[in-house]
Amino acid sequence: MMKIKYLYQLLLSHISILILAFVIIISLFSHFVKEFAYQNKVEELTSYAVQIANEFQSGQVDMRRLYPYQDILSTRKTQFIIFNEEQQPYFLPEGFHHPPREQLKKSEWNKLKKGQTVTIRADGRFDDEVSLVAQPIFVQNEFKGAVLLISPISGVEQMVNQVNLYMFYAVISTLVITILVSWLLSKFHVKRIQKLREATDKVASGDYDIHLENSYGDEIGVLASDFNIMAKKLKQSRDEIERLEKRRRQFIADVSHELKTPLTTINGLVEGLNSHTIPEDKKDKCFSLISEETKRMLRLVKENLDYEKIRSQQITLNKLDVPLIEVFEIVKEHLQQQAEEKQNKLMIQVEDHVIVHADYDRFIQILVNITKNSIQFTQNGDIWLRGMEGYKETIIEIEDTGIGIPKEDIEHIWERFYKADISRTNTAYGEYGLGLSIVRQLVEMHQGTVEIKSEEGKGTKFIIRLPLTAKQQ
């Protein structure tokens, strides 16, 4: 299949339309000019014929009065003949040698007798093609003859040809200018499309940083804007894929590390038991360590499975109206020992009437995970569990006086196994950030929001907002 460049396609389409338009316009204009010239010639002859015929209204006419008409008409190369009622000419112009009876046909003479004017725009009955007008002469309503005016149309044809020639020159000039302008415009548009093609090639090769400058509001400009948006989205997708891949690798490394530590401990203890190198009085402690490390691995696996179920929305929430102070008391009782081990104080601040609309077990899980995170990074400090009523919502705050979180790490704290501080790598269960990942997913499933306010060295505050039911509102 023959390939034609887009530039030439544009030019060909423009030129084809122009040529077609010019052909139609020239044809119509030429026809109009010709018709107008003939019509004008016939009207002029008719006007003179009527004036000459009016000279006979009195019944008698001095032939000398016709000579001025002859002089005027001769300058226009027009001749006239006057016939009597028997179709015999009794006034002939000088040098007119045609047989008189051949000047008018019988049908034309009959029309004249009826008082009708005979007009013929182009007739070839004479040596030259002429326009012909015959006007009847009536005296007191009695037919007395006719006036015949004859004018060659060569002048009309010459004028029409001259107009057509000028039209041809104008069309050629316009066509040349149009082709030049069309070439420049086509080059301009093709250049813009070429930039789009080059940008597309770069995107195809993996360069998503490309940006097309665009200051036009036409379709190509809109396409360039859409291309920039597409490239931006592709770049974001690539960055997100790379980030997720990095997180996946880090996740695998973290899980492997966290599983390796208890497995190494368990393996060492089992080998010690098998080889009887562990004293009898230490075996109970050995079994206790094996049990703790096994539970630690089970918790890790359970947390991951739980997170995936929540993320894929495979769990169903059973929301109830629960007194907030009741939940706070359960969380405090559950984590009191862990807090005391780090010399922390757990304190509750909530009025008895404050209600939260949530899934009981999952809401406790949310508070336990956040509170455990606060205990983990607070030493000899205070941890507050606060609750209050907001506008159509319940507000829960968990605030500590711990080490805080760097500003640049706050948005990443919800990621699995993310460690915002190097101190998180060697702490007990809870350092993985897995609990906070679950928190965010669960809060969103409750149609709520959770945010973090933190300042390094001063502490961290988690703010949870859960909507109330219609009845409570």
UniProtKB/Swiss-Prot annotation:
UniProt-listed GO biological process terms: osmosensory signaling via phosphorelay pathway
Taxonomy, superkingdom: Bacteria
Native organism: Bacillus subtilis (strain 168)
Gene for this chain: yclK
Segments on the Extracellular side according to the record's topology features: 31-164
Domain Histidine kinase: 254-470
Location of this chain's protein in the cell: Cell membrane
Protein name as it appears in the record: Sensor histidine kinase YclK
Lineage per the UniProt record: Bacteria, Bacillati, Bacillota, Bacilli, Bacillales
Cytoplasmic side: 1-9, 186-473
EC number: 2.7.13.3
